[in-house]
């Protein structure tokens, strides 16, 4: 699957966070998403697929989130029986950060049908400010929903939490709860998809229900 191919790296260059996300799209093409985030939340997304490069200006990116991702000592976990429960036990506490809502309209859906996960992830990075691995994972779900239901629009409601170690309140990971609502042209709800993503986990370990 697309999510299993995701590789993400971070570095800090003069207070600018550089995030590089690489993955293989559903059409077999290799994709690179190169995002920069400055302290004021502005930045740029440069995405390359099939030797074609596009650029988008970014605003309202959470510098704090990306700084923690770039400096966190949390290592990606291997999949096991405790994935999911390992960050919901009493040794961790979830701290609410924000709610966001983003609408994928009919024009964007048509672009996703052509561009695949690369287009979906780029839209989510711009609209919901998701970290690369989470954007690719949720983007994969979005592409699946679009191809399966051919919706007129998709509304994504997102809740963001920080997860801290309970014993010393130190940062562990970010937790993204995303719900995708698909509607037909008459405004009728067609499908609901939920995902829970932890930034310390590899994208393919995102939890679905």
Model-derived features: where do they sit?
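N-terminal propeptides/leader regions of secreted preproproteins
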Residues: 1-98
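Short hydrophobic membrane-inserting alpha-helices and related fusion/pore-forming segments
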Residues: 119-141
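Transmembrane alpha-helical hairpins and terminal membrane-anchor modules
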Residues: 140-152
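Residue-level signal for glycine
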Residues: 186-187
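Acidic, proline/serine/threonine- and glycine-rich low-complexity intrinsically disordered segments
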Residues: 195-197
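Conserved small/polar residues in nucleotide/adenosyl-binding loops
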Residues: 199-206
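Post-transcriptional modification and biogenesis factors for structured RNAs
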Residues: 209
């Amino acid at each position: 699957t697309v999510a299993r191919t995701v590789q993400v790296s971070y570095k800090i260059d003069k207070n600018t966070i550089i995030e590089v996300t690489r993955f293989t799209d559903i059409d077999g093409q290799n994709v690179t998403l190169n995002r920069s985030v400055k302290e004021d939340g502005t930045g740029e997304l440069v995405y390359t697929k099939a030797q074609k490069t596009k650029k988008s200006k970014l605003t309202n990116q959470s510098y704090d989130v990306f700084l923690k991702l770039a400096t966190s000592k949390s290592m990606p976990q291997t999949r096991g029986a405790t994935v999911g429960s390992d960050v919901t036990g009493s040794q961790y506490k979830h701290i609410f950060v924000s709610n966001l809502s983003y609408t994928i309209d009919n024009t964007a859906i048509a672009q996703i049908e052509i561009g695949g996960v690369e287009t979906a992830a780029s839209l989510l990075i711009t609209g919901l400010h998701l970290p690369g691995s989470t954007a690719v994972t949720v983007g994969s779900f979005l592409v699946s929903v679009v191809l399966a239901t051919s919706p007129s629009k998709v509304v994504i409601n997102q809740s963001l939490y920080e997860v801290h170690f309970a014993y010393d309140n130190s940062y562990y990971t970010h937790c993204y709860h995303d719900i995708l609502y698909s509607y037909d042209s008459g405004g009728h709800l067609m499908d609901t998809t939920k995902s829970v993503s932890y930034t310390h986990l590899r994208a393919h370990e995102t939890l679905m229900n």
